[in-house]
Amino acid sequence: MTLDVDAQKKDEKLLLATIHQEYKILAEYKMIESEKVSGIYVIPSYANSLQWFGVFFGRQGFYENSVFRFSILLPDGFPQDKTTPAIVFQQNVVHPLVCPFTNSLDISHAFPEWRCGEDHLWQVLKYMQVIFADPLECIRSVGSTQELSNVEASKLLTTNRDAFAALVQESIAESKAHIYDTPPTEDPHYIVFEKFQEDIHGPVLEQIRNGRTTNSPAESGGGGAATGLSWVKVKEGEFKPLSIE
């Protein structure tokens, strides 16, 4: 009898801890909504809130017109765990801070360890936005090139920008080539791209142009549909989200 009671208390404690963690993660999502970091769409997985789906849209510099899918992986003990969240791109991305073997983005220079209550996911997304807008500055901020995830990309950026730009364009083209691939998961929160269809998407585009919004995806988490489904519809050949910004 005592063992049953102890087991029940343990289960209740675990349930409360899970609920508390879910609340913290939801709070992170709400903060991302309020910050409105342009050009980045994210949403937690329906099946596992520790995994987030994201899409990055480059709007300037070397990465202008880029579309990169990525995942955010939170540690099991988030946000108390001092381990920083992991950002992993789905395709190869040429950048000094992106490992060419694992496609993971190194954020340790800005977030050496996770400080609960001080560090937030919207700051990670903002950092991501900044280092893609100016990769050369991110090299300077790191200091030693040997600490960079992609030393070769760093050397090219500082010595032969044309060659670096060419490699970046190759990675952008590769990513765009897979934009309409069948989703690797059945998770309903996975961000899906649909080819532009005038009869379906035309009215939505017209509403946006006229200043009226509809239930659309969350740009940096910003205000998805009530069901939590997240989708982005892009005009064929443009790869730009149908958003007001």
From Swiss-Prot:
Give the record's family classification.
Belongs to the ubiquitin-conjugating enzyme family. FTS subfamily.
Q: Which InterPro entries is this protein grouped with? A: UBQ-conjugat_E2_core, UBQ-conjugating_enzyme/RWD
Q: Sorted alphabetically, which SUPFAM superfamilies does this protein's record hold?
A: UBC-like
- This protein's gene is called cbx
Q: Where is the UBC core domain?
A: 20-177
Highest taxon of source: Eukaryota
State the name under which the record lists this protein.
Protein crossbronx
State the SMART domains in the record.
UBCc
The organism of origin for this protein: Drosophila mojavensis
User: Which PROSITE patterns does the record cross-reference, listed alphabetically?
Assistant: UBC_2
Pfam families reported in the protein's UniProt record: UQ_con
